[in-house]
From Swiss-Prot:
Keywords: Cytoplasm, Hydrolase, Metal-binding, Nucleotide-binding. SUPFAM superfamilies: SurE-like. It catalyses: a ribonucleoside 5'-phosphate + H2O = a ribonucleoside + phosphate. Coiled coil: none annotated. InterPro entries: SurE, SurE-like_Pase/nucleotidase, SurE-like_sf. Belongs to the SurE nucleotidase family. Its cofactor is a divalent metal cation. It comes from the Bacteria. This is 5'-nucleotidase SurE. It is found in: Cytoplasm.
Amino acid sequence: MKILLTNDDGVRAPGLAALAEAMGAIGEVYVVAPDREQSAVGHALTLHHPLRATRIENNIFAVDGTPTDCVNLGIHSLLSFKPDIVVSGINRGGNLGDDITYSGTVSAAMEATLMGIPAIAVSLVTQNDGGNYSAAAAFVVKLAGIVSREGLPDDTFLNVNVPDLPAEQLRHPVITTQGKRSYEGTIVDKVDPRGRSYYWIGTVDLNFSDIEGSDYNAVSRGHISITPLHLDLTNYNSLAALKRWDLT
């Protein structure tokens, strides 16, 4: 099995290193990842300046672009083959609920799915640097084997969130729905020494709704969460109501 790995934390991130080491047990591993931190870039694609790729080891490339760029460049140029699976991660921090819309990790897996390649996004749910990447990586190896054997439904990829716990403390994996986050974002408004305003976007607290069966509900109780995501963003529950609108 030929495996393409990427992430949004950068090519030298510990989560990516742990994943590459573990995945080597089941196939040939190739890494095409950003040369720097690219968290929260979403599904951004670089279109207005050229990309550059640097080979830092035989099968490892660093790209001065986004995770989506890395998947595109890897599959269409840097590799001489189409990978059997793409795995994005292991992200430092969870990708849960509505936050997946910001995630470069999740978007890289989505990009592979657009190309018809089975894909998994995986994150370690931690508030710090995380110490249990190896446990998460071991689970991804098992899951990748299942995906290789069973396949995935059309236009579907998996978003996996693993609690930052030793392997022996992790509870069994569960299939979950995408959860919901309560947004209470803050803007930090400051003035630099030259009198110019500058801003930081962010929030201290991530407040998720504890919805039964959701990704957050699972990981907050020590379970590994596996959420099937798909490319069609249509809200089918709203179609009937909207079709009753008088748009003439």
